[in-house]
Amino acid sequence: MPTTTQIQAWAERLRHAEATATPIAPLREEITDNDSAYAVQLVNVQYAQSQGRRIVGRKIGLTSLAVQKQLGVDQPDFGTLFADMLYGDDEAVPLSRTLQPKVEAEVALVLAKDLERPDTTLVDVISATAYVLPAIEIVGSRIADWNIRFIDTVADNASSGLVVLGAVPTALNALDLKLCQMQMTRNGDVVSTGSGGACLGHPLNAAVWLARRLANLGQPLRAGDLVLTGALGPMVAVNAGDRFEARISGIGSVCAQFEG
């Protein structure tokens, strides 16, 4: 197990990469186990909190087989969302806020109840969900050229960047999320398609996985938390001036407009 000093040093390296907009070499040659990678992530989450940033939820990453194939990984991970990451529908998003940005369309849940049990069930998640929103997650990597494997993205807060949320909530009981179809356009051209079934078979399966994982860590999901359940299709690179629109059947649409 790495020493506390080593964990702190890896975490600082990632912070420096973000602060200087200079991606770094992969960390997987130095961080050799998943627990250590999550320890690095936690150090930077705690550092962010010490700087006044407010946690508003969690994201689940690597739930789509298409995204897993793109990145060469084979299991989900999770990261932390902060209030200053969130943008509203069609709000201008500065491109400079994210290193090597890419976008993916997702289903977002907002919780009405805590999910504290390590044996959380699908029924528990359904009961705890206040509503769903369409979302565009803007992922970013502090690792050069997106040359990542599981350990790299975990340490890097699951490659979190920003989130653009739709503004019209939909009740879960009005939806079959597995059958929801997603289409995302960039400047009017279709660039990504998928469905709810691409997200661990069902977006709520991803939420169950996350609730159990966090409960076991003593960091359970709480009422009011935002949960990004994972990509519904392949992620797409972003350029200055791009406008993305994601439409998810039954849930609605959300737009992300990028400034230079």
From Swiss-Prot:
Pathway assigned in UniProt: Aromatic compound metabolism; 3-phenylpropanoate degradation
SUPFAM superfamilies, alphabetized: FAH
GO molecular function list: 2-oxopent-4-enoate hydratase activity; manganese ion binding
Alphabetized Pfam families for the sequence: FAA_hydrolase
Swiss-Prot/TrEMBL GO biological process terms: 3-phenylpropionate catabolic process
Keywords assigned by UniProt, alphabetized: Aromatic hydrocarbons catabolism, Lyase
Source organism superkingdom: Bacteria
Similarity comment: family membership: Belongs to the hydratase/decarboxylase family. MhpD subfamily.
Purpose of the protein: Catalyzes the conversion of 2-hydroxypentadienoic acid (enolic form of 2-oxopent-4-enoate) to 4-hydroxy-2-ketopentanoic acid.
Protein's recorded name: 2-keto-4-pentenoate hydratase
Species, as recorded: Comamonas testosteroni (Pseudomonas testosteroni)
